[in-house]
Amino acid sequence: MTIVLGLDGSMTAFGWAALRLGESHELDEPVGLGCVRTSKEAAARHVYMADDDGRRLDEIADVLIAAVQLYEPRLIVIEAPAGAQHANSAKALGLSYGLSRTLARCFDVPCITVQAEEPRRVLVGRRNASKTEMEDWCLSRWPTSLGLLRPKASKPEREGAFDALTVAATGARSAVAGPLRPQRKAIVRASWDPTEPSQG
């Protein structure tokens, strides 16, 4: 089983999706889907913001490490940070992106990055497709994928998980993923017809 792991980085709702590659992308199938939720607790814990960020990264890393160990992906696909962000948002995106790259490096898994609008363009055909449209695309393509999420998943969890699934699906269509796909078994035909009478 060849798996592509898609990651949609965020400090608040970090989505991940494991996509099993088929002989063609029409035969790809999600086998794992989830989202890690974390929240700021620096004030409540009376700790520095940097230490609280570290705690949140640890929580995310624990889940991602477990996913890599379980699914043993052959390729990790990450959505690149994009858009104008204020300082805190930019820092959060940078931390989550760095965590994704480090995860791939530590497990020696090839890693590629896709731009934020690329899944929308490749899968839906419009760069400005909404998160709801992307989720609808996933559910139309894989009707049972919602069952991979935990019961009563919140809207942010669904968005993070399905964003990660579209990232994985986009990466699965890349030139890098092509050689990883299982090959169709060749049909060996007999050089003689067993129904014909033997000669000699």
Regions inferred by a protein language model and the residue ranges of each:
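Phosphate- and other anionic-substrate recognition elements at nucleic-acid/protein interfaces
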Residues: 1-200
